[in-house]
Structure formats: structure tokens, C-alpha cells
């Protein structure tokens, strides 16, 4: 399987299914990711959060400043190249392939920008994203309604940081020069986007004030990453404490069931990431598991079947002479 020091991986397609309000229990065995006892049944994080009997009130209900306006939607930036509808002209695509082949470019390094700096930042950002006067997404409902977190810009940042840390854990298991590059691209894009949003959405008109905000967010990011690392390397209680200090802002009267729900949510994401090979992860084959979905551990037989399919797929891709230079990779697909 894997360890804290080396987050090795396998296959992505773990069995995911929507959790109905009532279903037969599926039991998970202990692993380095799932630390619950095998006698403990696993509901989805969303159902666990909703099961609390405390009926606690939303935190900071008077502060509902939206993190994004509905009238001015900018998915990531002004660049048209990050639009899901954009298609590169054929001549540019052909020229790019020629340059890659001629200069023997390492696509695993080049790919870090569009994958980590664009796609992975996008999915981290979207987990807590909200639009003024528009319904929340299912994941945003989990954080703002089920966990009763305040709907503020700072809270959105903490939700984004939590998901970035989850990806950092997997990136560190990649070969060092690639994993470090992916982490740097993700962090760089985070702060370039925050700077853009401070000026255009939060209406910050002073460069000095914006710089101070960026320094504060950088401090929060470093502190959160250190705290989550400590929790992941020790025990669930320490990880829950890190979640309380960062995601919940160290507020009093926090519902412990909500903390348990977030810890379960984290372990679910890490388990899915542990099933991904380096090549799959580096080429953007990961999506966060929605909080309403339950993750079930694969059986040894399922592991072997999925591993065999993945190996066959990438062996055929590497041997195919029609595979474009931009689609090739040196990263492992067997780990």
C-alpha cells in the first residue's frame, strides 16, 4: 500500500457511489490512510455531518460576504486558454509537437503548468466557491450549510488550502524534481489568482494593502500545511486539531461531529489519490470525491484487475508510434 513518508499509489477507479439516506454498511479495513477500525462503518462525510444532533447555529451568520459576484464571472483569469471551450489551432498544435520533438523537452516538467497551475488549482478553488444570488454547489453546501462555516473570502481561502494540501501529499510522492515543480506551480497560481480577485472582486484599490493581504494569506498557507502534515504523520486527533485551528478558525463551541466529518473527508480523498499512479496523477486524472459520496476500499482482486488494465493501457500508449510527443511521459504507471 503506502506510508506517510512515501505516498505510493495504485489505481484510480475505486468504487464510488452516492450514499442514500439508508444503505447496507460496507466495512473498511485499516490502512495507512484509513485509520478507523474495521468494525467502524463508514457513512459519507456529508451524511456524518448531517447526523449531528446538536443542531448548532451557523458560525458568524452576520458575515456572508460573497467570495465571487455573479455579474463578473472569471473562471481563473482573463486568459482564453483556460476556458474549457478553447481549442488550440491546428497549426499551433503541430508547431508545438515539432518543438517538443526537436528539443527533446521533458513533458513531465512542462506539463506541471497546465495540470497543477491550471487544472488542479481550478478544482481546489471550486470546492468552496460561491456566487452571489446563485445556489451553492453540492460541495459548497457541505462546507457552508452542513458544517455551518461562514461565507467569507477568508473561509473560501481556507477551504482551498485544505484541498491543495491534499494534493501536496500526493505530489511529494512523485520523483522529487517533478513533485516539487507541481507544488510550486500550484502555489504560484494560487497567489496570482488571489491578487487578481483582490483588485477585481474585493475592490482593493491600494497595492500596499493588497501586498499585506497576500503576506497574510501566505502565512496562513504555510501554517496550515505544517499543521496538516503534523496531523497526517501522527494521529486523527492531531489532524482534527489542525482542521479546527485552520478550517474552523479555532472558534469555540465547534461540533465534534463536524470535525470527524472533515477528517473522514480528508482520508477519503487521500485513499483515492493513493490508488493513482504517478503518470495518472501528473496528467490530471484526479477529481475530488464529493462529500456525499462514500469511498469503499478495493479488494486485493480488484486491485490486481485495475492494475493490469492500467499497465496494459499505458504500455500500448508508449508503444504506439502515433502517440504525440506531448502525450508521452517518463513517469511510472505501475506504482
UniProtKB/Swiss-Prot annotation:
Record protein name field: Protein CBP3, mitochondrial
Key words of the record: Chaperone, Membrane, Mitochondrion, Transit peptide, Transmembrane, Transmembrane helix
Other notes: Present with 14200 molecules/cell in log phase SD medium.
A cellular-component GO term for this protein: mitochondrion
Transmembrane stretches, start-end: 152-169
Domain of life per record: Eukaryota
Protein task: Chaperone required for the assembly of ubiquinol-cytochrome c reductase of the mitochondrial respiratory chain.
The organism of origin for this protein: Saccharomyces cerevisiae (strain ATCC 204508 / S288c)
Listed InterPro entries: Ubiq_cyt_c_chap, Ubiqinol_cyt_c_chaperone_CPB3
Transit peptide extent on chain: 1-38
One Gene Ontology MF term: mRNA binding
GO biological process: mitochondrial respiratory chain complex III assembly; positive regulation of mitochondrial translation; protein stabilization
Compartment(s) where it occurs, according to its Swiss-Prot or TrEMBL record: Mitochondrion membrane
Protein family membership: Belongs to the CBP3 family.
